[in-house]
Amino acid sequence: MSASDDLYTTAVHAGRASVHALGKHAPPIDLSSTYPFDDMDAAARSLTELAHGASTAETPVYARLHNPTVARAEQAVAELEGATDTVAYASGMAAVTAVLMATRTLRDDRATPHVVAVRPIYGTTDHLLTSNLLDVDVSWAAPDAIAESMRPATALVMIETPANPTLDLVDIQAVVDQAGDVPVVVDSTFAPPVIQRPLEHGATLSLHSATKFLGGHGDVMGGVVSTSDADWAAALRHVRVATGALLHPHAAYLMHRSMPTLPARVERAQSTATALADRLQAHPAVQAVHF
């Protein structure tokens, strides 16, 4: 079986093990806001564990802490990314914000984190980094000059590749090599996991606006961050619980529903885009084509 076949199969089955255990074919939508429990001590333990970033507990207690529909969608993305954990949010920008907030909580001194970022980057991400809405110290660097921008307080390197909407590309592995022990987050929204998996190139975090390819049908907003670092996963869930920026179960259901067709959709989109780019490049009225 080829790698392409593997991805097609993974996309169909990802996040569905618990569905099969329920004796169902399609994932159900769990819209409960609270969950009953018989043991107050177990509920208290679960609340504490989930509030501090655990992925599961004896009981969900409250939908802001855990929701089975959201968890299945997260598992599906994690399997496609080759990650151990995915944390879902209400939007791509909620995911970006959570990464920046988690960066601070993971520092022992809780000092203002220094972030090295590469432009071009998604416009609202750029705004978030420069607007002082978050207590983050940002240095902008060229992709080949990241090492020169690093400081002892540098807590994160942030890139987007391909960039939205310019399609500028950044060599992920080259950035990771320059970053050393500093975590690298890659906004890979324009290159879904069937095209690019940043963790395979050494990135600590892979981020997507699920509103684009992952949702794929123009009817869902969401954001996801995938990682195989347990501390990061816990910190990201902690931020989500504390800020309430959770993905609604119905949106999670729609995103998960879209996973089986992701490889086919991306393949067809790439084929159409290639044909269109070829035609535009040959047109005398077109000065430049970014593809």
How should each PLM-predicted stretch be described?
Residues 24-25, 71, 82, 219:
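Short, basic and Ser/Thr-rich N-terminal targeting/leader segments
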Residues 27, 33, 221-222, 287:
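Structural beta-strand/beta-sheet cores of well-ordered domains, especially the beta-sheet scaffolds
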Residues 5-11, 74-79, 202-204, 208:
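Short, hydrophobic/aliphatic alpha-helical segments
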Residues 34, 39-97, 124-131:
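Conserved N-terminal alpha-helix of the aminotransferase class I/II PLP-enzyme fold
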Residues 12, 62, 214:
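Short clusters of hydrophobic/aromatic residues that line enzyme substrate/ligand-binding pockets
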Residues 1-57:
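N-terminal glycine-rich, Lys/His-bearing helix-loop that initiates the first secondary-structure elements
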Residues 17-20, 85-283, 290:
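Conserved PLP-enzyme active-site core in the AAT-like
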Residues 51-56, 231, 282-285:
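Short, glycine- and charge-enriched coil/turn segments that flank and shape catalytic ligand pockets
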